């Protein structure tokens, strides 16, 4: 097994920190994150629900939760769902930890990961997730950088491996080229079916969608969000 080193070190901060953290945020990074962070150096449990303190009925993954607006909203809506949140940027992780310090009950059905989501996807057991959310990922708008986009054949294979049959992959973006890119890859993948009846469905937010600061900015700049859902066959 490849050893995964903790990311809370000088390299992590130099690469992934934006604004300077407040003292209480630094404290949570040092004390609460090690408790909730998934250690990939340990074998994945055969029953992934054992990761959580609370008894959970299903498990969902959010990749790149940013400031945590959507993930916090979903945790409050679904207290019997276990959530795994991935965010490699320290400022977003710090905001999430501040929320968890205030709403301590959610610590019992949330686990975190602060590095590359592909490492976590490779660690997870087969068919262990009920859903995966990827909202407003970095679009890498320059064509020469499109190969860096998170949606690619290898990652779709990863999603297919860890999702249960009938599990949902949800994707939102305000960048047309990334929406088209995502549709192309998913509709050409043997393991996924696009859940849409009419083009109008693309523009309808998910039920009780809380929106995010990034989405609000996109709307102010006249970029129209698109919401896609794909089902694991």
Swiss-Prot record:
Binding, S-adenosyl-L-methionine: 62, 87, 116, 138
Pathway field: tRNA modification; N(7)-methylguanine-tRNA biosynthesis
Protein name: tRNA (guanine-N(7)-)-methyltransferase
Disulphide bonds in the chain: none
HAMAP family named in the record: tRNA_methyltr_TrmB (MF_01057)
UniProt-annotated binding residues for substrate: 142, 174, 212-215
Name of the top EC class for this enzyme: transferase
Keyword Cell membrane set for record: no
UniProt keyword Transferase, yes or no: yes
Transmembrane intervals: none
Family membership: Belongs to the class I-like SAM-binding methyltransferase superfamily. TrmB family.
Originating species: Bartonella bacilliformis (strain ATCC 35685 / KC583 / Herrer 020/F12,63)
PANTHER family: 3-DEOXY-D-MANNO-OCTULOSONIC-ACID TRANSFERASE/TRNA GUANINE-N 7 - -METHYLTRANSFERASE (PTHR23417), PENTACOTRIPEPTIDE-REPEAT REGION OF PRORP DOMAIN-CONTAINING PROTEIN (PTHR23417:SF14)
Active site: 138
């Amino acid at each position: 097994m490849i050893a995964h080193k903790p990311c809370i070190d000088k390299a992590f901060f130099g690469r992934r920190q934006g604004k300077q953290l407040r003292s209480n945020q630094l404290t949570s990074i040092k004390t609460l994150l090690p408790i909730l962070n998934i250690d990939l150096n340990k074998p994945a449990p055969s029953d992934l629900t054992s990761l959580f303190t609370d008894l959970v009925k299903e498990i969902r993954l959010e990749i790149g939760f940013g400031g945590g607006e959507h993930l916090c909203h979903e945790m409050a809506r679904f207290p019997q769902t276990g959530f795994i949140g991935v965010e490699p940027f320290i400022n977003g992780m710090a905001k999430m930890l501040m929320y968890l310090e205030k709403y301590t009950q959610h610590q019992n059905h949330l686990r975190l990961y602060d590095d590359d989501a592909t490492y976590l996807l490779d660690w997870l057991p087969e068919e262990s997730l009920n859903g995966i959310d990827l909202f407003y990922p970095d679009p890498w708008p320059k064509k020469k950088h499109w190969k860096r986009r998170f949606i690619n054949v290898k990652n779709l294979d990863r999603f297919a491996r860890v999702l249960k049959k009938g599990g949902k992959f949800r994707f939102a973006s305000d960048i047309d080229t990334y929406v088209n890119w995502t549709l192309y890859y998913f509709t050409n993948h043997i393991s996924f079916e696009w859940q849409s009846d009419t083009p109008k469905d693309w523009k309808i937010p998910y039920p009780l969608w809380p929106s995010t600061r990034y989405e609000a900015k996109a709307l102010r700049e006249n970029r129209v969000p698109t919401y896609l859902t794909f089902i694991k066959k």
